[in-house]
Amino acid sequence: MIGNWNYGTGRRKSAVARVFIKSGKGDIIVNGKPVADYFARETSLMMVRQPLELTNHGATFDIKVNVVGGGETGQAGAVRHGITRALIDYDATLKPTLSKAGLVTRDAREVERKKVGLHKARRRKQFSKR
C-alpha cells in the first residue's frame, strides 16, 4: 500500500498496466483519460469493469491506471489483471471470488515467433506436386 492507495500490476500479451485504487466514487482514469474515452470498444470496457462488478465494488473506488504496450484488447486485459491484484491488496478475502472467475491467473499466451523458411509462425509455403 502506497499512502492510502492500493497497487496492482497487470500484464497481458505485451501490455503492462500499473493500477492504483483508493476509496472514492467510482472514477476510472486510464492514461489521463476517462475509461470510456480511452477504450473505444464496449467489450474492452466490460473487461475492465469485470472484477469490480464481480465483487460489488463498482462505485466504491477511484482508479488511476498507467498502461503501456500492446493493443486495445491486450491493454484492457492488463488493466483487468491489475485491478484484480489491487483489489486483493485492498482486501485479501476477495481472492477466492476473483480466483473462481479466473481473474487472478495471468493469461500466459504470447504471440508465437515467426520461423525461418515459413511465411508466418506456422504457415508454410504452398506445396506443388508438379
Swiss-Prot record:
Keywords, comma-separated and alphabetical: Ribonucleoprotein, Ribosomal protein
GO biological process: translation
InterPro entries: Ribosomal_Su5_D2-typ_SF, Ribosomal_uS9, Ribosomal_uS9_bac/plastid, Ribosomal_uS9_CS, Ribsml_uS5_D2-typ_fold_subgr
Domain of life: Bacteria
GO molecular function, one term: RNA binding
Gene Ontology terms: cellular component: cytosolic small ribosomal subunit
SUPFAM superfamilies xrefs: Ribosomal protein S5 domain 2-like (SSF54211)
Pfam family, one: Ribosomal_S9
Similarity remark: Belongs to the universal ribosomal protein uS9 family.
NCBIfam families named in the record: PRK00132.1
Name of the protein described by the UniProt record: Small ribosomal subunit protein uS9
